[in-house]
Design a protein with these regions (language model features):
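Alpha-helical recognition segments enriched in aromatics with Gly/Pro capping
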Residues: 1-91, 195-202
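Small-residue-rich helix-loop
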Residues: 96-190
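Short amphipathic alpha-helical interaction patches enriched in hydrophobic/aromatic residues
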Residues: 47, 87-90, 107, 165, ...
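Conserved glycine-rich FAD pyrophosphate-binding loop
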Residues: 181-206
Length: 206
């Protein structure tokens, strides 16, 4: 068999990619929640480009259009940020049902599959890899143990919020939002501050 290799990979700063300085194992990226097909797609673009200028394509399409004559001699740049962007495209193109299973298995099946399913519409446009999911959604599964802001002086405020929410009969996002906006106006609190406090008390984070 005849073997061919591309030039040495470089970092975005044009320095040589090194296993002593950079994560070069596929297992590292898989552990971050990068899909194998996204990683393969990105690596295919190292030293080669699609004849139609496409960045996203399947392995089957790659096999069909690849020509060894198109390999470039210039040392390609391996950019983890670009890889994450590409993986994000794969996430957004994936059916919610399949993404639910991916997240469920990535989290070692420790969290409710049904609840994961309900949170996907909230984060699908925001995450770029599966490891991004839990930092955004952990508060759905367990009460925060730490809070980034001290809210102990706002107990009366949250009592008023609680009382207002108890009045809501039709528990829908737009109705809840309208009730909270009206309460903020009644209490003469800016929406930005009002909802920041709400975010912190629910998620523990700013």
């Amino acid at each position: 068999p005849i073997f061919v290799h591309i030039s040495l990979l470089r970092n975005p700063d044009k320095s040589k990619l090194s296993k002593r300085k950079n994560p070069v194992w596929t297992s590292y990226y898989l552990d971050q929640g990068i899909f194998p097909e996204a990683l393969l797609n990105y690596l295919a673009l190292m030293g080669w480009s699609h004849p139609e200028g496409k960045e996203i394509f399947s392995l089957e399409e790659y096999i069909q259009v690849f020509d060894i004559k198109d390999i470039q001699k210039t040392a390609p740049v391996f950019d983890p940020v670009k890889l994450e962007w590409m993986n994000g495209v794969y996430i957004r193109e994936m059916k919610n049902e399949k993404l639910k299973i991916k997240i469920f298995e990535f989290l070692n099946k420790k969290y409710s599959k049904d609840l994961i399913d309900k949170t996907i519409p909230l984060i699908k446009e925001r995450i770029k890899k599966l490891s991004d999911y839990l930092p955004l959604c952990e508060f759905f599964f367990k009460t925060p143990q730490k809070y980034e802001v001290d809210l102990t002086d706002k107990k009366e405020f949250f009592k008023k919020v609680y009382a207002e929410l108890e009045k809501v009969i039709d528990w829908k996002a737009n109705i809840i939002g309208e009730a909270l906006v009206n309460l903020a106006k009644k209490l003469e609190i800016k929406n930005s501050q009002f909802f920041m406090d709400m975010r912190v008390v629910i998620t523990g984070k700013k």
